[in-house]
């Protein structure tokens, strides 16, 4: 969090310590069902321990035109490639919808549940997912590129970025 705050001025920050999240399933459940209660702005930047802002000058207000933006998953079919949640920007509206009774829960990671399992439901509610062309400037995870992105996700990228 300190690495992100060093480069960017947020409208507020919340560091949540309770309840203890000790599994992938518990993390997904918290993000999908509880996170919206802690958001006091129109958007939330999700930053897991293995990702953060690397190019603050790469920020674009274009990112705020979408309810969900995260790194491209190149192994998914076109139209479903935007999805990594480890460093992602989400609207409060999206976070409220993931806690609704109509959202279908599974044991998949929360980002898969949002971007694949419930995508049609969310889009029918007016949720907009960023297109690949925009997401590539927001963050990267597995996709190698020369684009200077706003942030990244994945400890496997630390060496590549010279962060060791």
Task: List each model region and its residues.
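Short, solvent-exposed loop/turn segments at secondary-structure junctions
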Residues: 19-21, 50-53, 74-76, 93-95, ...
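Short, conserved loop/helix-junction motifs that constitute active-site signature segments
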Residues: 38-40, 60-64, 90
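Active-site-proximal specificity loops/subdomain of glycosyltransferases
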Residues: 1-42
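Conserved donor-nucleotide/metal-binding helix-loop-beta segment in metal-dependent transferases, i.e.
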Residues: 51-82
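A short acidic, often aromatic-flanked loop/helix-cap motif at beta-alpha or helix-coil junctions
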Residues: 18-27, 76-77, 135-139
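Short beta-strand-to-loop acidic/aromatic patch adjacent to the donor-nucleotide binding site
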Residues: 41-54
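Catalytic core and acceptor-binding pocket of nucleotide-sugar-dependent glycosyltransferases
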Residues: 80-164
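Alpha-helical elements of Rossmann-like donor-binding domains used by nucleotide-donor carbohydrate transfer enzymes
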Residues: 3, 30-34, 58, 68, ...
